[in-house]
Amino acid sequence: MAIITMKSLLEAGVHFGHQVKRLDPRMKRFIFSERNEIHILDLQKTLQGIKDSYELVQRVIKDGKKVLFVGTKKQASEIIEQEARRSDMPYVNNRWLGGMLSNFNTIRKSVQKLKKLEKMEVDGTFDMISKKEISQLNREKFKLAKNLTGIKDMETLPGAIFIIDPKREQIAINEARKLKIPIISVVDTNCNPDVIDCPIPGNDDAIRSVALFTKIISDAILESDKEVGIQIIENLNEEDLMKEIEIKNDKSDSIEEGRSNL
């Protein structure tokens, strides 16, 4: 059973929003307070978002479907791949190609081409063609692999999509919404939560925060067949929470710097 505590969220810097001037007004309901011109997210609502997302993921997996992990920004790319692989799920961590969902059949043809090139490399075909042809095929394979490796085994559309940074992955969100694929996403204070089915208010820039959220989704997948849920321990009252926030603020030269260094 996954155990999530308020303190673990604080330690990962989940509560740090962006500068006040960057607020998307639709995120106001997720704001706890303001410190040094930086918004602090309401971790009670983060915990609720985690719980809702955990339950949705487990329903999707029990229905025999996949969860597609998406995160192409520098802070998320490696984490997305690691956690998707750990839970044997498809992922996109380099670039979202337009049509990955909305033009799925065409994308599958590109995937089949990639698989064919990979097979040619090991079945002896390359031994029967010129070095120039091999070079051309390798370039083509590299180009395809760069964007399609993570979805090679995704034979059908996913049952849900998990996204880090919805502002960056707007095309993916548009395609998922068009196809009515449920969207789970970490939403920072500069995001629009209204286009997300399961928004998780949180810092989508700090590596530790991104890693924590992605691990939670991966854990939900791995535990879906064990009939176990998620245990949330709210081990800080509001007064203690404020103290912890002040301590975290004092430890960094600025909160905005802390977003990426935590």
UniProtKB/Swiss-Prot annotation:
CDD domains: RPS2 (cd01425). GO terms for biological process: translation. GO terms for cellular component: cytosolic small ribosomal subunit. Pfam families: Ribosomal_S2. InterPro entries: Ribosomal_uS2 (IPR001865), Ribosomal_uS2_bac/mit/plastid (IPR005706), Ribosomal_uS2_CS (IPR018130), Ribosomal_uS2_flav_dom_sf (IPR023591). Keywords: Ribonucleoprotein, Ribosomal protein. GO terms for molecular function: structural constituent of ribosome. It comes from the Bacteria. Gene3D superfamilies: Glucose-6-phosphate isomerase like protein, domain 1 (3.40.50.10490), Helix hairpin bin (1.10.287.610). PROSITE patterns: RIBOSOMAL_S2_1, RIBOSOMAL_S2_2. HAMAP family: Ribosomal_uS2_B (MF_00291_B). Belongs to the universal ribosomal protein uS2 family. This is Small ribosomal subunit protein uS2. It comes from Borrelia garinii subsp. bavariensis (strain ATCC BAA-2496 / DSM 23469 / PBi). The lineage of its organism: Bacteria, Pseudomonadati, Spirochaetota, Spirochaetia, Spirochaetales.
